[in-house]
Amino acid sequence: MSSYSSNNNPIETGQNAWLSINSFPYKATILEQNTNCDWLILGGGFAGLSAAYRLAHLRPKDKVVVIDALKIGEGSAGQNSGFMIDLPHNISASGNYTDSLEKDKKTIELHRHAMRFAKEIAEDCNVAKEDFLQIGKINGAATESSSVWNDQYQKQLLDLNEDHQIFDRKEMIELTGSEFYESGLYTPGTVLFHPSNYVRVIATKLRESFEIFDNTPAISMNFQNNSWLVQTPKASISAANIIFAINGHIQNFGFYKNRLIHLFTFAAVTQKFSSEQLSGRDQWGITPANPVGTTVRKIKDGDGFRLLVRNQFIIIH
C-alpha cells in the first residue's frame, strides 16, 4: 500500500491586493461530505484548473473533483504580477542572450501554445476582456548602462525575426507619465491579466461541469484496492487517479526531496491615483532590461489607477 501525508498546509499571511481591484464576486465551497471521482486534482490554480478544463474535453463522462487548500484566487495563482510572456529573454552574466536560436524557437512555440490555450479557456469561461489584455510589454531601461541589455535583446529578436519596437526617452514618458526610464523595448505578444479574477471566473464556470472545493487541503492519501483514499479535514475522497498541481507544496508529501528550490518574489500595489496624479497610458507592463531590476505595471481600477511594483525575492532551500 502506498501512503503519503502532509502536516504542512499552505497559508497566506499577507493581503492579496488583487482582491481589492475590481474583484470578481466568488463564493467558496468546502467539502463536508465523502465523495468519489475518476480524477482528483490537487490545486485550484492555473495548472489545476487547466487540467480540469482539458479533462472535461478529453474525458467528458469522467467525474472530476478539484480541491484547494485555500480559497480559489488567494494562493500563488491569484497573487502574481499577471504577465503571460511569450518570448524568452535568458541573459548571461556578461549581458549576452545565450540560448541557441532553435531552442528559443521551440520555447516560443511552447509559450504561445500555452497562451492560446489560456485564451481559449478565458473566452469559453467568459473572463472579462479587461482581465485578459494582449497589449504586450516593455523591457524598461532606467539608465544608459541598462540599455546595453536591451541592445543584446534586440539582436536576439532580430535573429528570431520577432516583432519589436524601440521606445526612446520621450516615448517612455508618454507611456508611463514618468521621467524615470531612458528607453524601452516593446514586444506585442505578452498578455496582462488579473490573476485572481482569471482563476475565480474559470472556477465558477467549471463548477457547472464538476465539483470544486475551497479551503479543503489534502491531509493524507492511501492507495488500496486500486483506488486512492484522500483525507481532508471534514471528509474523504475516493479517486481512481490523482493529478498534483500544487507547485512546491508537493515536497510536503515526500516527493522531490532535496531537488526543488522555492523562489518567492514580493510586490506591492499602491493606493488609487487619479489620471491627473498618474498620467500616461491607461494600462501597461514593464519588465526590467537589467534582470535584477524592478517590474512595474499600471492597473486600471474603476475610475482610477494603481501601480504594482515587484523588486525583491528570497530563495528557500
Regions from the language model: what does each represent?
Residues 43, 87, 232, 239, ...:
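Short, well-ordered coil/turn residues at beta-beta hairpins
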Residues 98-205:
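Rossmann-like flavin
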Residues 82, 116, 124-132, 218-220, ...:
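Active-site substrate-recognition segment that forms the wall
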Residues 43-49, 69:
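Glycine-rich Rossmann-fold phosphate-binding loop(s) that bind the pyrophosphate
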Residues 56-79:
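Glycine-rich FAD pyrophosphate-binding loop
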